């Protein structure tokens, strides 16, 4: 947090949250007129398992997941279903284009470097984007899709464990993995 400019925090919220919100605001009136449809938001496992040194990314995805849950109830009377896919690591150009915010003299320097290295390795070995697209297609044709769907079995297990394990233990594990 200390090494991130507020303008960078605004930018990631603008992209990950407000970008989706703007699209939703445009499609909802059309969907209402057409008698329904399905809105599928791409959130992240990080929405529920907040990743150290990815605090703003995690926060944007948590906001998007919460929006999806709330809209589901608001839009249901119009036949509009809302769900969120929570992928984990996906092989995309995001890995190579990630901005590293830690300053050379940062108190977090080595920890951020290690954390980013772990994330980049996981992303290079992640799911292909096509796997997430398949989940979206399946949700779009589902009569009553779930509110949230993990992006793959591995992440479904992580989300399940997050629900049953004590929060302190989950935080400890995430800190060991990423901090």
Outline where the language-model segments fall.
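C-terminal helical subdomain
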Residues: 84, 106-155
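Active-site helix of classical SDR
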Residues: 24, 60-63
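Substrate-binding pocket helix/loop in short-chain dehydrogenase/reductase
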Residues: 1, 8-10
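Hydrophobic positions on the long internal alpha-helix
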Residues: 23-27, 41, 67-68
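Residue(s) in the substrate-gating loop at a strand-loop-helix junction
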Residues: 44
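Active-site loop immediately N-terminal to the catalytic Tyr-X3-Lys motif
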Residues: 2, 49-55
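C-terminal beta-strand-loop-alpha-helix "lid" module of Rossmann-like NAD(P)-dependent dehydrogenases
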Residues: 72-123
């Amino acid at each position: 947090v200390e090494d991130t400019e507020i303008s960078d925090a605004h930018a990631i919220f603008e992209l990950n949250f407000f970008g989706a919100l703007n699209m939703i605001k445009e499609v909802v009136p059309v969907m209402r007129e057409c008698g329904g449809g399905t809105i599928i938001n791409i959130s992240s496992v990080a929405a529920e398992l907040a990743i150290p040194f990815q605090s703003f990314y995690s926060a944007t995805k948590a906001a998007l997941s919460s929006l999806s849950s709330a809209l589901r109830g608001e839009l249901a009377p119009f036949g509009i279903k809302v769900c969120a896919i929570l992928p984990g690591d996906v092989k995309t150009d995001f890995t190579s284009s990630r901005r590293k915010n830690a300053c050379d003299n940062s108190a977090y320097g080595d920890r951020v470097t290690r954390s980013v290295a772990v994330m980049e390795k996981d992303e290079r070995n992640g799911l292909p984007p096509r796997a997430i697209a398949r989940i979206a297609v399946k949700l779009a044709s589902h009569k009553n899709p779930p509110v949230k769907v993990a992006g793959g079995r591995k992440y479904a297990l992580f989300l399940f464990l997050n629900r049953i394990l004590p929060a302190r233990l989950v935080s400890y594990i995430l800190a060991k993995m990423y901090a």
